[in-house]
């Protein structure tokens, strides 16, 4: 029922032709098509005269559409899942629907493997999100508080400290 999720399903691989390259031993690759595709959305929206309100949502899902399945190429760590949920925010459910719909192959064994991987990532998201409550996450410390606690003036260092706190939470080094 989400027309923009359906739109993303149609356009998420739009940059594959521009990024197609043959790598010896690997075959055809499309490295970076997700980032280039996200950057192409603004001009596509303008050419098609689409409303710009859903553009950030569409760009985000195009940019992130490979991330959930890429998690299973390594051990699915809590910090990787935290970063995914943090980056996707409220759109993580739509992102996972897109990933599930993108599992296509004529090879039944490959489809089974991808679905198993998808289920693993989905389960891990539920576990981590249940523990950490990351959706709509807000940093626990505001810039003004950092300035007051550290005796700093407004500036770059405040942002550096705020980002370091955010990274420590996402890595699980300090609790949320």
Language model region names:
Residues 1-99, 109:
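Conserved, hydrophobic alpha-helical core segments of structured domains
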Residues 42-47, 105-176:
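Charged substrate- and nucleic-acid-binding regions of tRNA-handling and nucleotidyl-transfer enzymes
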Residues 102:
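Family-specific functional microsites
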């Amino acid at each position: 029922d989400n027309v923009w999720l359906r739109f993303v399903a149609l356009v998420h691989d739009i940059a594959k032709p521009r990024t197609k390259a043959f790598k010896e031993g690997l075959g055809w690759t499309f490295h970076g098509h997700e980032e280039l595709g996200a950057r192409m959305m603004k001009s596509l929206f303008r050419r098609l005269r689409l409303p710009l309100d859903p553009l950030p949502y569409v760009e985000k899902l195009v940019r992130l559409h490979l991330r959930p399945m890429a998690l299973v190429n390594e051990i699915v760590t809590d910090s990787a899942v935290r970063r995914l949920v943090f980056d996707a925010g409220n759109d993580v459910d739509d992102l996972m629907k897109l990933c599930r719909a993108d599992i296509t192959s004529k090879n039944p064994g490959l489809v089974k493997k991808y679905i198993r991987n998808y289920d693993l990532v989905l389960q891990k998201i539920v576990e981590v999100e249940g523990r950490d409550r990351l959706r709509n996450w807000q940093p626990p410390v505001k810039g003004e508080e950092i300035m007051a606690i550290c005796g700093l003036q407004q500036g770059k260092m405040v942002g550096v400290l705020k980002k370091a706190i955010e990274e420590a939470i996402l890595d699980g080094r300090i609790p949320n």
